[in-house]
Structures are given as structure tokens and as C-alpha cells.
Amino acid sequence: WNYSHRYPKEFDHWKPSLFGIENPAYTDLKLKPELNNSYDNSILYTDWFLSQVIGTLKSTNQISSMMFVSDHGQTLYDGTCNLAFHGHNTEYEFHIPAFVWYSDIYKFTYPEKIQRLVRNRRAKLTTENIFHSLLDMANIHYPTERLERSFFSQKLKKEKRYVDSYGWSDYDNASLKGDCREVIDKGTPLHQEK
């Protein structure tokens, strides 16, 4: 991926970047500064965009909330690791950014949800928690809901966190191997159906 394609020119803040480089060889370690700077610029643009969304929500003076969750992390030649992008089963790819924003009116209307959100802020979660948390955040209830997976709920339960690393590996029972911090299950990973 050419990260410079993910932001407009006015967000090309950190340089040198991949901006203007046609078909860069992403595996060329000589382009590490350009790759990392372009990635950081794309995050700068994402932050700006999210701040615009939050500003719009704030201006409505309504009960409002927003959740942001990335789909995966990235390995970006971190330290002495010579890998980039994702699909390498590294710790960098399994840790993802996420946050919740809520209006003052939301906090006033649902103080117990905010208390539980704060209490659960250090819980070990997976993206499997997102669907259930989004519905709970929106106060949407249904007969088969699973509040034990919502980080807005007092019923939140710790569950095994499986990641796709040579089968379904128990992330919390894994060791981190090598400079790239590759996730290796200490036990036997669950078989994946193809």
C-alpha cells in the first residue's frame, strides 16, 4: 500500500514521504523513512477526519457517541524487524487502536454505561466485542443479545482472545518470537476450517 494515497497533499507533513513516488518498492529497506513518514501522515489525516466527525456530533447538542476501531495493525520495519504491512502474525498487527467518544448529554443520560466503560478500559478485548458493544452503546436490545461481550456492560466476561497465527492461536498464551515479535501459541492452535 502506498500510504501517501490515503491523505491529501496538505497532510504530507513528515518528509521524506512516498508522495510523488511512482510504484515504490515497499520491500526496499532504503524506503523505510518514506514509508514510515507516509504512514504517520495517513494517521495525521485520520485524526483530523475523526476530529471533524466529533465536532459535527458535538454541534448537534444531542445524545451522541462514536466508536473508532481499526481493523488491524501494521508492521512497519519496527526496530530491527525487516517486515512491513500486515499478514506476518506479529504483535504489531494484532494490537489495534480504538476509542469511544460521547457527548455530555450521552454521559448524563447513560451514566452507568460510562462508569462501566471506564471500569472496563483496561480489559483485554478483541474485535468480537465490537458488535455487542456498539449495540449496547446505542441502547439497542434484542432477545439474543450477548452483554457479556459488551465493554459497556457490567456483565462483561474475559474470554480467550484468538488470533490468526498458524491456526487460531490463544493470544494470551503465546510467546513473541524474534525481532518482529511473531505471535506463537505455547499450546496447539485450533484448526482452521478452509
Walk through the language-model features, giving the residues of each:
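Catalytic domains that recognize anionic headgroups
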Residues: 1-194
